[in-house]
From Swiss-Prot:
Residues 1-36 are annotated as: Disordered. It is a multi-pass membrane protein. This is Aquaporin PIP1-1. It is found in: Cell membrane. Pfam families: MIP. It comes from Oryza sativa subsp. japonica (Rice). Expressed in roots, leaves and anthers. Gene3D superfamilies: Glycerol uptake facilitator protein. Its main location: membrane. Induction: Down-regulated by osmotic stress, chilling, drought and treatment with gibberellin and abscisic acid (ABA). Increased expression in the recovery (post-stress) phase of gibberellin and abscisic acid treatment or drought.
Amino acid sequence: MEGKEEDVRLGANRYSERQPIGTAAQGAGDDKDYKEPPPAPLFEPGELKSWSFYRAGIAEFVATFLFLYITILTVMGVSKSSSKCATVGIQGIAWSFGGMIFALVYCTAGISGGHINPAVTFGLFLARKLSLTRAIFYIVMQCLGAICGAGVVKGFQQGLYMGNGGGANVVASGYTKGDGLGAEIVGTFILVYTVFSATDAKRNARDSHVPILAPLPIGFAVFLVHLATIPITGTGINPARSLGAAIIYNKDHAWNDHWIFWVGPFVGAALAAIYHQVIIRAIPFKSRS
């Protein structure tokens, strides 16, 4: 028995550096096993000569194309039915958006980071997680993918597409532009904050399961935001999604409030980046110490 007790003592001493739970994780030993990655350069000319740079852009294009194709088709399926009980309803639409984000982030995270959203790209750029060159390239490819995805849906079901709003985001009757803007800001804040938390490099360094599970909370956040804001704006929180549907549908009312679906998500993404980097992680203060 004495030998076994000694083994237990040795084991406890050997693994005493394991990560504490809760606020204890904020102790003085934080820097022993983790070093903050350097910020991405604003411009990185070498990227333009790398195939991985263009491969990542293509991945963003294809992912956003598939995202718009599945989600807009789902919206059309609900819109054409006179009885919402006979279709998947709002919950089904929310699941299609959240489920596709879950699947596509899982598929593309190792190639491009799995942004699939200019607001996510913008937030990560503000946090210096990627260069301006890559951010602009991603946003362009995301918008092109969204336009093509919505265009294919219209090609399959033109009458249904044009007769049921084309999945374009508009502020619903009974709500003001301020309501719509606020819903888009808060909804995008939730999404981008979840992205920062789920992909946090410090957590990844300490918990090996975090990178594998990251797509799940991101997709679930998209699902929940859609449940809450579909009745208000149809839920944008993704400027590429809103732009693609608006361009292909191309009716006046789809453009009247279109600015909301760019300003709202970008403001929400900026707030999420500031909150996570400055308040939660205190990155600026660490760099001075």
